[in-house]
Amino acid sequence: MKPKIALVGVGRFGKNHLRVLKELEKDGLCTLHGVVDKSNEILENVKKNYDVATTSNLDEFLKSDIDAVDVVTPANTHFELCKKCLTNGKHVFVEKPIATNYAEARKLVQFATEKDRILMVGLIYRYNPAVKKIKELIDLKKLGKIYYTFGHYMGFKEPRTDVGALLNFTVHHIDIYDYLLEEMPKEAICSVGYFLGRENFEDLAVLVLRYRSGSVGIVEGGWLPPGNYRDLTIVGSKKSVTSDLSKQTVILHDIYFERNDDTFKAIDKGSSTLAVKFEGPLKLELKDFVECIKTGRKPVANGEVAARTVMIAEKALESARLKRSVKIHESK
């Protein structure tokens, strides 16, 4: 079985989805049935460069025998588009965030369950080889007890007009921590900035998450600083890890503290760069979506996981608005 997939949205990131879906088609894993976009100019460009059907009307494809839809559109369109696809019996991959609020995210999970369809979300760092290597180290207890994690997801570029920094940037680290620590945070402490003067969309978010195990997760995200930051650090009781997520490097630091009564000695036995095979996470992600369609297996980046990240982001915004910490009661 080669699932037939329609792609909705060929904008900034949708172009990458188009390229990867054509690669998977060439590999014999799926068929790209067609492309949907509201821009005639974009559709004309797609027709010039790819042998694929195009339309501005999604309903044309939903009435056909396609198996799935890949939604890469602005976040404020995700709910209605995904709802339409799911209720028409199609499997859905949707870029993050799954929706712009937790209530809509939960409804999409419900629709997928009722229709017995795959709902997968573009939480791409679950497929990043560096993150998977770090997950392996944590699961093997190589790092000991996780004290805290911190990272940056930020860089100077044109800000999105559909979501702010929390749902565009920090949501990635929220999910990475969820994946690595396998627990819900109990508390969110967040500060945001509206430096560009957009009342509804924060340009900067600095978030601290406290977990029931005692671990702390910190992430900073936004459009303002020069450069491009995609990094992650995990500090454990036995060893620590640093990673450049873009380069997919993982460095293991053999550092820890020796206690003698009330004094501590910092032990540094050096560091080593671990072997990580560089692979494009988007291709790994979409390849897994195809496999989930074929087998019925629940995706690693499923709707429940994605809804959880939106809920935590909502709590972060609440914390920023109230200027105090906010409890997170949702159980995992």
Annotate each language-model stretch with its function.
Residues 172-251, 279, 283-297:
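Contiguous beta-strand/loop segments that form the cofactor/metal-binding neighborhood of enzyme cores
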Residues 99-158:
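A contiguous active-site-proximal alpha/beta segment in oxidoreductase catalytic domains
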Residues 17, 50-111:
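Beta-loop-alpha module in the N-terminal Rossmann-like domain of NAD(P)-dependent dehydrogenases
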Residues 122-129, 153-187, 202, 211, ...:
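Mid-domain beta-loop-alpha active-site segment that forms a flexible
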Residues 2, 60, 68-71, 290-332:
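C-terminal helix-rich "cap/oligomerization" subdomain common to oxidoreductases
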Residues 1-49:
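N-terminal Rossmann-like dinucleotide-binding module
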Residues 16, 38-41, 273-287:
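Active-site loop of classical SDR/Rossmann-like NAD(P)-dependent oxidoreductases
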